[in-house]
């Protein structure tokens, strides 16, 4: 489960940003195409925050839907996988424009 190490890294990033202040809430953005399972991050969060400035912090996850842009006709459309064809022209040269995110969006500290 790589979500454990990802969650540990998120906590480290939050602690550095908090500059010694207690962390009350963390909001993450996780894209549907990121390969990260939000439920697994939620499961790991409590264990990863134990004994840190983020212990007891609330975690919210904003899920970012996948979107792609067709390289052939420039149509922007929802994608669920990297292999979705363009619904307008059927081409497979799709550039992902959203859904790969994995970032700390907000941090609430004391």
Swiss-Prot record:
Top-rank lineage group of the source organism: Bacteria
Binding-site list for Ni(2+): 2
Residues holding Zn(2+): 70, 73, 86, 89
Keyword Cell division (UniProt): no
Keywords: Metal-binding, Nickel, Zinc
Keyword tRNA-binding: no
Pfam families listed in its UniProt record: HypA
GO molecular function terms noted in the UniProt entry: nickel cation binding; zinc ion binding
Function noted in UniProt: Involved in the maturation of [NiFe] hydrogenases. Required for nickel insertion into the metal center of the hydrogenase.
Family: Belongs to the HypA/HybF family.
Protein name, entry field: Hydrogenase maturation factor HypA
Source organism of this protein record: Geobacter sulfurreducens (strain ATCC 51573 / DSM 12127 / PCA)
Gene that encodes the chain: hypA
């Amino acid at each position: 489960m790589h979500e454990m190490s990802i969650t540990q890294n998120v906590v480290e990033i939050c602690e550095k940003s908090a500059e010694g202040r207690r962390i009350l809430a963390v909001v993450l953005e996780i894209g549907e195409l990121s390969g990260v399972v939000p439920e697994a991050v939620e499961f790991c969060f409590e264990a990863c925050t134990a004994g840190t400035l983020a212990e007891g912090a609330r975690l919210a996850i904003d899920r970012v839907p996948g979107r792609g842009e067709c390289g052939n006709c420039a149509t922007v459309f929802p994608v669920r996988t990297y292999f979705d064809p363009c619904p307008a022209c059927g081409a497979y040269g799709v550039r992902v424009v959203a859904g790969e995110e994995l970032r700390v969006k907000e941090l609430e500290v004391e």
